[in-house]
């Protein structure tokens, strides 16, 4: 059989090879934070875990263990063993863990062994793996030169990053496009899951032959996902590349992202009528979120233009009026804010250019 315990030296390999992991923590623990390659098959359900925890506080470890055995017994125990065995059969290279790699891991492994199923458990459990990934994030800015990709809203930074092996897509990991209108249809990950996925992406990046780590110039918050402080501080000190694009191209890109993609996504999810209502709410509420910064008069003007565009879209299947409010939003809000921020980091700008020019500059950076 394989080694019964997976040691800390193998943590990196677990994530790089996306080993399937059977997570036997309670569902509430899994929901708070987990790894992309893990599946929750709990030893105890939330209610059972709560009872055992109360017993432990009141009567000690042995009484809590005895209660746990009485709660997970007979048909319930057999059902859980069968679920674990099915998972291991489908994933023969799987590992298992609980929170600390303690009693729950050992008991699960023992019960499976009695059912003639062998599966190693991970030393230190979820907690140790999580600490390992936090260390990966903190160390990443010291592993390679860090470059920050900046550019006006709508210039196509994400499109550009997705074409580069040097890049890690922070907005993709956060499932948010970073701007006031950056919310997607599916929810953002929990903060813990955002950090876990960021660390794994950084690990994968380190296996490439990229000469630098290229990241989009982000705020501390991407939607509600907060960048780890040490990592964010390093980004703030990084040299900057500025991606340039024409105003017309920016407008078309933003109409496609804010209007066409979001409308199609909502309709696909909810149907035509409910989808349009949800899409309209997304646009109007995104505008409300920056009302204080716009000022009441500017917000009202944009809201009126947005409503006219929505009316034209639903009545005439024409999205051209959306270009009017997007253009005003760019020139009255996004562009002045961007230029102010860029001025503060002007001394760190290494290069400015179009998509093609930026590709050529980075290609030459690889060979320096």
Curated annotation (Swiss-Prot):
InterPro entries: Rhodanese-like_dom, Rhodanese-like_dom_sf, SelU
Enzyme Commission number(s) of this protein: 2.9.1.3
Tagged with keyword Cytoplasm: no
Signal peptide: none
Example GO molecular function: transferase activity, transferring alkyl or aryl (other than methyl) groups
UniProt keyword list: Selenium, Transferase
GO-annotated biological processes: tRNA wobble uridine modification
Catalytically driven reaction(s): 5-methylaminomethyl-2-thiouridine(34) in tRNA + selenophosphate + (2E)-geranyl diphosphate + H2O + H(+) = 5-methylaminomethyl-2-selenouridine(34) in tRNA + (2E)-thiogeraniol + phosphate + diphosphate; 5-methylaminomethyl-2-thiouridine(34) in tRNA + (2E)-geranyl diphosphate = 5-methylaminomethyl-S-(2E)-geranyl-thiouridine(34) in tRNA + diphosphate; 5-methylaminomethyl-S-(2E)-geranyl-thiouridine(34) in tRNA + selenophosphate + H(+) = 5-methylaminomethyl-2-(Se-phospho)selenouridine(34) in tRNA + (2E)-thiogeraniol; 5-methylaminomethyl-2-(Se-phospho)selenouridine(34) in tRNA + H2O = 5-methylaminomethyl-2-selenouridine(34) in tRNA + phosphate
Active-site residues, as the UniProt record annotates them: 98
Family label: Belongs to the SelU family.
Subunit structure: Monomer.
Name under which the protein is recorded: tRNA 2-selenouridine synthase
Organism: Shewanella baltica (strain OS223)
Gene from which this protein is expressed: selU
């Amino acid at each position: 059989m394989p080694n019964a315990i997976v040691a800390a030296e193998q943590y990196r390999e677990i994530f790089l090879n996306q080993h399937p992991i059977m997570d036997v923590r309670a569902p509430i623990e899994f929901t708070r934070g987990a790894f992309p390659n893990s599946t929750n098959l709990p030893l105890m359900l939330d209610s059972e875990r709560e009872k055992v925890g109360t017993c432990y506080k009141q009567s000690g470890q042995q009484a809590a263990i005895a209660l746990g055995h009485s709660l997970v017994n007979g048909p319930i125990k057999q059902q859980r063993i069968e679920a674990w065995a099915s998972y291991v059969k489908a994933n023969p290279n799987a590992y298992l863990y609980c929170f600390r790699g303690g009693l729950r891991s050992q008991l699960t492994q023992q019960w499976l062994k009695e059912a003639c199923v062998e599966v190693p458990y991970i030393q230190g459990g979820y907690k140790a793996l999580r600490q390992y990934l936090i260390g990966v994030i903190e160390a990443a800015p010291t592993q390679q030169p860090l470059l920050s990709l900046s550019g006006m809203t709508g210039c196509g930074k994400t499109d550009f990053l997705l074409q580069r092996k040097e890049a890690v897509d922070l907005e993709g990991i956060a499932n948010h496009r970073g701007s006031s209108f950056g919310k997607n249809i599916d929810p953002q990950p929990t903060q813990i899951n955002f950090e876990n996925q960021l660390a794994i992406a950084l690990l994968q990046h380190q296996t490439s032959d990229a000469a630098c780590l290229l990241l989009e110039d982000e705020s501390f918050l991407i939607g509600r996902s907060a960048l780890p402080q040490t990592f964010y501080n390093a980004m703030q000190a990084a040299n900057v590349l500025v991606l340039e694009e024409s105003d017309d191209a920016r407008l078309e890109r933003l109409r496609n992202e804010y209007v066409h993609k979001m409308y199609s996504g909502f309709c696909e999810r909810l149907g035509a009528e409910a989808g349009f209502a949800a899409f309209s709410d997304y646009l109007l509420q995104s505008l409300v979120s920056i009302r204080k910064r716009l000022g009441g008069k500017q917000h009202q003007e944009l809201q009126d233009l947005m409503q006219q565009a929505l009316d034209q879209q639903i009545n005439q299947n024409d999205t051209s009026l959306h270009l009017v409010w997007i253009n005003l939003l760019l020139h009255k809000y996004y562009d002045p804010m961007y230029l102010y921020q860029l001025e503060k980091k002007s001394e760190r700008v290494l290069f400015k250019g179009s998509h093609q020019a930026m590709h050529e500059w980075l290609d030459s950076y690889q060979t320096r």
